[in-house]
Amino acid sequence: MVGDKPIYVQMSEWLENEILCERIRENEKVYSQYQLAEMFNINPATAAKGINILADQGILYKKRGLGMFLSAKAKEKIQYRRKNHTLKKLVEEVVVEARRLGVDEEELIGMMREASRPDP
């Protein structure tokens, strides 16, 4: 894993992406901390920190003796948080940069429409 975020945060975001892509479904068992540690070549305690982030957010729940499972509505919770926090922050940063560069609202909206078009 590469980036400026801690490895356990990157791993929890990877798990979120797996959930968003529906590779893990509601009430399905998720990877154990040991499986994740092996997959990402990290310490199991680090993997556990990433899992705990999602458990603290209600994305995962624990079944005693069985492991961690995906909560109902987990995908919707992730989408809501990312849309209302992550995406909003990114848009605000783009708007600030556009202002610095003298890009007006109409031009910026045009750029966003262009970027959102599917590739031919």
Regions found by a protein language model. Give the residues of each.
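Short alpha-helical linear motifs
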Residues: 52-57, 73, 106-107
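Short, charge-rich, low-complexity interaction segments located
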Residues: 66-84
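Hydrophobic alpha-helical segments
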Residues: 9, 44-47, 64, 95
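Extreme N-terminal segment that seeds HTH/winged-HTH DNA-binding domains in transcriptional regulators
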Residues: 1-30, 34-35, 79, 85-120
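N-terminal helix-turn-helix
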Residues: 29-62
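Beta-hairpin "wing" of winged helix-turn-helix
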Residues: 23-24, 28, 56-65, 69-72
